[in-house]
Curated annotation (Swiss-Prot):
The gene is HEK2. The lineage of its organism: Eukaryota, Fungi, Dikarya, Ascomycota, Saccharomycotina. Pfam families: KH_1 (PF00013). It comes from Lachancea thermotolerans (strain ATCC 56472 / CBS 6340 / NRRL Y-8284) (Yeast). It is found in: Cytoplasm; Cytoplasm, P-body; Nucleus; Chromosome, Telomere. Coiled coil: none annotated. This is Heterogeneous nuclear rnp K-like protein 2. Gene3D superfamilies: K Homology domain, type 1. The keyword Nucleus applies.
Length: 285
């Protein structure tokens, strides 16, 4: 495990499948209790909600203790010799492919490489990536791991998955640095947190893309994202904005909801806000 010591309390959340959760808990809760005691952290897994295909592991304590505990979790999951699962719930499928024989010469070493799905708020993901990817590149080179962030938000939230692949000790060491990065960039209180998602919600979702000219995007988002956040709450939808403009210099607002009516309402409100902003600017001329 990493040797750096940090005493400030940190909290990390990890996305796990039902099968992974069972392995982490262990018979009569013995495995998770052992991790809890050896790392001196608070660690637990969310209740198994009916219809949900995932659970969330939460761990809090010192940066080093949390990193060690999560490294131990990766080690426990590596002991499963069965073939990797393919999940119908897409966020559970790993983004990174398994390491190839050309990357790791020793077959026994390959078995010790694991993957971690760290849940991070969207605003903090950019802090991990850094300017032009400089920070994420530094993490990869320093710790000998692979790190990638999901492009999409987790359903009904403003959280994304930061996936880390490597040896358990290397992942733990990387987590210490990530904890420092996140401590310097606190998560905004208004961002919606992810909770285990039911399969029926995912399968029955409705999505609509709305192209918005780049020059109006800031106005539609509002200060600190408050305008689009209000739209989300009122219509009970998820709204994701593309990072880069398309060839027509538009950014795409992707609206997702559990039914056609809520998505249509969000689309109508968004376009009405656009027309209002256009009119406001024309009146200024």
């Amino acid at each position: 495990m990493a040797e750096v010591e940090h005493q400030d309390t940190v909290n990390h959340r990890v996305l796990v499948s039902l099968k992974e959760a069972a392995r982490i808990i262990g018979a009569q809760g013995m495995t998770i209790q052992k991790i809890r005691e050896s790392s001196k952290v608070k660690i637990g897994i969310s209740p198994h909600e009916r219809g949900c295909s995932d659970r969330i592991l939460s761990c809090s304590g010192s940066a080093q203790g949390v990193a060690n505990a999560i490294g131990d979790v990766v080690e426990v999951l590596n002991q499963d010799d069965s073939e990797p699962e393919t999940h119908s719930y897409k966020p559970l499928n790993f983004i990174l492919p398994a390491p190839s024989a050309t990357e790791i010469q020793d077959p026994e070493s390959v078995k010790r490489i694991g993957n971690l799905r760290l849940i991070v708020s969207n605003s903090q993901v950019s802090s991990i990536i850094g300017t032009q990817g400089s920070r994420i590149k530094s993490l990869i080179e320093k710790h000998g791991v692979k790190v990638v962030a999901s492009k999409n938000f987790l359903p009904d939230s403003q959280d994304r998955v930061v996936e880390i692949q490597g040896f358990p000790g290397a992942i733990a060491s990387c987590l210490v640095d990530i904890s420092e990065i996140l401590a310097a960039e606190p998560k905004p209180s208004h961002e919606k947190q992810y909770y285990p998602h039911t399969k029926s919600q995912e399968e029955g979702s409705v999505t609509k893309d709305v192209a918005i000219p780049v020059e109006y995007v800031g106005a539609l988002l509002g200060r600190g994202g408050n305008r689009v956040s209000s739209l989300r709450k009122y219509t009970k939808t998820k709204v994701i904005v593309s990072d880069e403009p398309d060839e027509e210099n538009n950014r795409v607002f992707t609206i997702t909801g559990n039914n056609q009516n809520s998505v249509k309402l969000a689309e109508t409100m968004l376009l009405k806000n656009l027309e209002t902003e256009k009119q406001r600017r024309e009146d200024k001329v």
